[in-house]
Amino acid sequence: MHELSIVESLIELCEENALNNKAYNVQEIYVKIGRLSGIEVDLFKRCFETFKENSNICKNAKLFIELAPLEILCLKCDQTSILEENVFKCPKCQSIEYKIIQGEDLHLMRLVMK
């Protein structure tokens, strides 16, 4: 259940951004969660609703989540592909030599503050 610590860090980051921008209220938080991030989205939402109550700045914030697909760059044929299933090879040339471009992380994309 690492979602607890991730949500706690997210709220701290939002509070820090608000203070740095002389805002007193975060209204909307937009995040992008990668398919391979290991984050359970429903649990993440529940943790957010619980933890935001302890924050004066984020207490009324709404959370918006975008799911990022798993995107790879094949190091053999230079093809960029989105993998729909957990088959870790290039769909074009079948190579297993690739670099993950997106889909492993959580990113804070945007804050709406007042």
Swiss-Prot record:
Keyword Transmembrane: no
The organism's place on the tree of life at top rank: Bacteria
Disulphide bonds in the chain: none
InterPro entries recorded: Hydgase_Ni_incorp_HypA/HybF_CS, HypA/HybF
Biological process annotations from GO: protein maturation; protein modification process
Chain residues that bind Zn(2+): C74, C77, C90, C93
UniProt keyword annotation of Zinc present: yes
Positions annotated to bind Ni(2+): H2
Function, in words: Involved in the maturation of [NiFe] hydrogenases. Required for nickel insertion into the metal center of the hydrogenase.
UniProt similarity note: Belongs to the HypA/HybF family.
HAMAP family linked to this entry: HypA_HybF
PANTHER family linked to this entry: HYDROGENASE MATURATION FACTOR HYPA
Name listed for the protein in its UniProt record: Hydrogenase maturation factor HypA
